[in-house]
A protein has these predicted regions:
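Extended macromolecule-engaging scaffold surfaces
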Residues: 1-127
Length: 127
């Protein structure tokens, strides 16, 4: 059964973004302070070796953080519910994590960089 799941997940993966777990958790917590309370939507933009994490709330303002990342591929943008992502990230033990994406409409696969012991899948949000 596990082989079938991995085969399906591989179909979705086009780009791999490598991040330091603690740094991304800290950035997400700060950016989420400004996110809409109902959706907790956070936008991820990856380009030129940088990940830009941003959110906004009408009437309050916006937040933005940049983090260097290991990434090769075309520029990509996608949205995620920060609460779901934080739940996954705090459950992982590795120093680095991998966000694996195909585009902004397909599931995002999250796992430790050097391990496939735990694999999480989060559906993106349309922003």
């Amino acid at each position: 059964m596990q082989k079938r799941i991995k085969a399906i997940l591989v179909l979705f993966i086009m780009y791999k973004i490598i991040l330091k777990t603690k740094e991304i958790i800290e950035s997400l917590k700060r950016v989420t302070l400004v996110a809409e309370e109902e959706t907790r939507a956070v936008k991820f933009s990856v380009h030129d070796g940088l990940l830009v994490i941003s959110s906004q709330r009408i009437g309050t303002g916006d937040a933005r953080e940049e983090r260097p990342v290991e990434y090769r591929g075309e520029d990509i943008e996608f949205g995620l519910n920060s609460r779901y992502l934080l739940d996954v990230l705090t459950a992982l033990d590795g120093e680095e994590i991998s966000l694996e994406v195909h585009d902004n409409k397909t599931p995002v696969v999250i796992k430790e960089k050097d391990s496939e012991a735990t694999i999480a899948v989060i559906m993106p949000m349309i922003l």
